[in-house]
């Protein structure tokens, strides 16, 4: 087995850089098409709080769907978990992340899981707060605490772009509201959802969040309980079964690490008890996952024996 160090990470980045040519940056949200297609970076923070990085690890990008497990954690902390899962399911969908189809054909009508757009809109509606502003501040505060970065904020150019082009998400939200799964005002829920997807981070932030999840919800630096062990376990389970869109099964076989991707090009991975990983590569495959990022994680998992199965 190889030893984790920056030399290894630089080798892995170098050997997988060619895969950045095999994908395309997201363009359906206009602001995302400004990303540099050939960027590729990684950061790892291990259980001893050692940080290793290589490539474009400090490049800023928006979190997009990687926000979903974090907002799920908030929903589980704010509500009884049976209440959460009476509104959103626990099963992989096998459909694209923005599909509406199963909201109509499923017997329950509720979203299959919290890692697809419909499910994440539901969990966003379950965040406590007396008004939209309080919910937004609580959400940002939680992201900042998990990442140990008080400078994390919303990229308002991306937020406006998301809001302007978010008709499909609007359709989902109003359908879910009509079936009783959305709590509160639909437009307020959507506004918070678009803002959470527009939070700007880098690979170091993702690695820090990943290690705190890997450490069962306990801050690796100061021992603070950021979430319960049960919540961290539920979140990592969804990352494993549903975190890579409709390529989650293939990723589980080839990589075997709980992970969540986003169309901004990021992937956050959490190896229980061992490390948190943040990867950035904005060239995406047809399912919305970073082409080179997945390859980087596959090689890393094989070389460090990270597969949890």
From Swiss-Prot:
Entry superkingdom: Bacteria
Alphabetized Pfam families for the sequence: Glutaminase
Keywords in alphabetical order: Hydrolase
Reaction(s) the record says it catalyses: L-glutamine + H2O = L-glutamate + NH4(+)
GO molecular function, one term: glutaminase activity
Enzyme superclass (EC): hydrolase
Protein name (database record): Glutaminase
Organism: Clostridioides difficile (strain 630) (Peptoclostridium difficile)
Source organism phylogeny: Bacteria, Bacillati, Bacillota, Clostridia, Peptostreptococcales
Gene designation: glsA
């Amino acid at each position: 087995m190889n030893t984790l160090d920056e030399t290894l990470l630089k080798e892995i980045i170098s050997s997988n850089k060619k895969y950045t040519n095999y994908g395309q940056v997201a363009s359906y949200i206009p602001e995302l098409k400004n990303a540099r297609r050939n960027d590729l970076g990684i950061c790892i923070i291990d259980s001893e709080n050692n940080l290793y990085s290589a490539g474009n690890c400090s490049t800023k990008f928006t979190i997009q769907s990687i926000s979903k497990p974090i907002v799920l954690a908030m929903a589980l902390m704010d509500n009884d978990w049976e209440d959460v899962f009476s509104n959103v399911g626990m099963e992989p969908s096998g459909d694209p992340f923005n599909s509406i189809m199963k909201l109509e054909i499923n017997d329950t009508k509720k979203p299959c899981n919290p890692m697809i757009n419909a499910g994440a809109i539901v969990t966003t509606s379950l965040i406590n707060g007396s008004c939209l502003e309080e919910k937004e501040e609580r959400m940002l505060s939680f992201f900042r605490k998990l990442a140990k970065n008080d400078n994390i904020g919303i990229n308002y150019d991306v937020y406006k772009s998301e809001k302007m082009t978010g008709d499909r998400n609007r359709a989902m939200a109003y359908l879910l509201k009509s079936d009783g799964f959305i709590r509160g005002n639909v437009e307020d829920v959507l506004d918070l959802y678009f803002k959470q997807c527009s939070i700007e981070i880098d690979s170091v932030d993702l690695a820090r969040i990943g290690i705190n999840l890997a450490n069962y919800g306990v801050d690796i630096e100061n021992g603070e309980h950021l979430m319960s062990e049960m919540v961290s376990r539920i979140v990592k389970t969804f990352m494993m079964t549903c975190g890579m869109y409709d390529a989650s099964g293939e990723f589980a076989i080839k990589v075997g690490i709980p992970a969540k991707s986003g169309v901004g090009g990021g992937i956050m991975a959490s190896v229980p008890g061992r490390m948190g990983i943040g990867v950035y590569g904005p060239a995406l495959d047809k399912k919305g996952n970073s082409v080179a990022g997945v390859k980087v994680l596959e090689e890393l998992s094989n070389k460090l024996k990270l597969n949890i199965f």
